[in-house]
């Protein structure tokens, strides 16, 4: 009873003091920071990224598959880059601004193969950047540990990443041939023999070799409008840089000279477009009796008469 009376006295004492002064305000205690805004830094970064598609299946050297499911980060300046091999590359601005940038720089797409060696991983179909999608190339280099060592942007919307790993230190760790199943290895062996026997041209060899890599899942099948399918892309785009266009032109010029040499060697007449009157270009062409069948350059097969 005494305790109840004491409590009642305390309550009456506070009530007697009257309301708080006009200048005072009640303080509201906030236990958690707000998470309003798409790019709020307190929001988990992965929850606000919307990829355009799923990544391609894991492929390539079997010993690299252990990198799948792992992520490696690097902070440069005010940005944090995160590489998840065989998944994607993301970029996050390290700031508390409400509109801090977070985006996808590419989703795992295919390998880059040069001289029959895995040279890099292409991450494509990232977030929109001007008139196209962001994309990244990941170069694998030998290192003491798995780590994302460097990130740069050599051209607009195209990023270059260097990933160090002890998994590629062996000189044969990135060779393509040993990773292929037996059936595709046999196709490659036959292709090499056909090239030696001059049953196919160099162009046909490269085309057939790419088909082997596509069947293995290392490269994606090229589509006519693949570049245009990227958001905001330009229709009919074939070369991303002037250097790649010049290299392709040089390779075609060399192939033309080589084929002209073969025709001359076998006595097959041919005319240069610059020396042929315009009327002959558009007029009907009547094949000459006994003339050897011309080379069929697209499939890369040579005529039997050669």
UniProtKB/Swiss-Prot annotation:
GO BP terms, alphabetized: carbohydrate phosphorylation
Taxonomic source organism: Bos taurus
Protein's gene: GNPTG
InterPro entries for this protein: DMAP1-bd, Gtb1-like, Man6P_isomerase_rcpt-bd_dom_sf, MRH_dom, OS9-like_dom
Domain DMAP1-binding: 176-279
A single Gene Ontology CC term: Golgi apparatus
GO molecular function: protein homodimerization activity
Domain MRH: 69-171
SMART domains: DMAP_binding (SM01137)
Positions of glycan attachment: 88, 115
PTM text: Cys-245 mediates the formation of the interchain disulfide bond for formation of the homodimer. Cys-142, Cys-157 and Cys-169 are involved in intramolecular disulfide bonds formation.
Main location: secreted
Domain of life of the organism encoding this protein: Eukaryota
Compartments it resides in: Secreted; Golgi apparatus
Compositional bias (Basic and acidic residues): 295-306
Annotated region (Disordered), positions in chain: 38-63, 267-306
Name by which UniProt lists this protein: N-acetylglucosamine-1-phosphotransferase subunit gamma
Signal sequence region: 1-24
Biological function: Non-catalytic subunit of the N-acetylglucosamine-1-phosphotransferase complex, an enzyme that catalyzes the formation of mannose 6-phosphate (M6P) markers on high mannose type oligosaccharides in the Golgi apparatus. Binds and presents the high mannose glycans of the acceptor to the catalytic alpha and beta subunits (GNPTAB). Enhances the rate of N-acetylglucosamine-1-phosphate transfer to the oligosaccharides of acid hydrolase acceptors.
Keywords, ordered alphabetically: Coiled coil, Disulfide bond, Glycoprotein, Golgi apparatus, Secreted, Signal
Pfam family for this entry, one: PRKCSH
Subunit structure: Homodimer; disulfide-linked. Hexamer of two alpha (GNPTAB), two beta (GNPTAB) and two gamma (GNPTG) subunits; disulfide-linked. The alpha and/or the beta subunits of the enzyme constitute the catalytic subunits.
Organism lineage string: Eukaryota, Metazoa, Chordata, Craniata, Vertebrata
Biased composition (Polar residues): 38-49
PROSITE patterns: DMAP1_BIND, MRH
Coiled coil: 239-266
Disulfide-linked positions: 71-84, 129-157, 142-169
């Amino acid at each position: 009873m005494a305790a109840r009376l004491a409590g009642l006295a305390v309550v009456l004492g506070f009530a007697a003091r009257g309301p708080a002064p006009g200048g005072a305000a009640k303080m509201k205690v906030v236990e958690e920071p707000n998470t309003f805004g798409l790019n709020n830094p307190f929001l988990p970064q992965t929850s606000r990224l919307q990829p355009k598609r799923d990544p391609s299946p894991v492929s390539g050297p079997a010993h690299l598959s252990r990198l799948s499911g792992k992520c490696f980060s690097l902070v440069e300046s005010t940005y944090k880059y995160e590489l998840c091999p065989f998944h994607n590359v993301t970029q996050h601005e390290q700031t508390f601004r409400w509109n801090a940038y977070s985006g996808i720089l590419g989703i795992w797409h295919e390998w880059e193969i040069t001289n029959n060696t895995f040279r890099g991983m292409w991450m494509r179909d990232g977030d929109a950047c001007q008139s196209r999608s962001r994309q990244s190339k990941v170069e694998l280099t030998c290192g003491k540990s798995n780590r994302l060592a460097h990130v740069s942007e050599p051209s607009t919307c195209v990023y270059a990443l260097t990933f160090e790993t002890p998994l590629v230190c062996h000189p044969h760790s990135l060779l393509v041939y040993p990773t292929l199943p037996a059936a595709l290895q046999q196709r490659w062996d036959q292709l090499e023999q056909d090239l030696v026997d001059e049953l196919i041209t160099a162009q046909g060899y490269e085309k057939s070799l790419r088909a082997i890599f596509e069947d293995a899942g290392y490269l994606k099948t090229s589509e006519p409008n693949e570049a245009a399918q990227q958001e905001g892309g330009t229709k009919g785009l074939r070369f991303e840089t002037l250097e790649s266009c010049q290299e392709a032109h040089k390779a075609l010029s060399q192939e033309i000279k080589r084929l002209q040499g073969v025709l001359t060697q076998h006595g097959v007449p041919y005319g240069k477009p610059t020396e042929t009157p315009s009327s002959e270009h558009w007029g009907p062409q009547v094949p000459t009796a006994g003339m050897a069948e011309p080379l069929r350059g697209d499939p890369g097969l040579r005529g039997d008469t050669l």
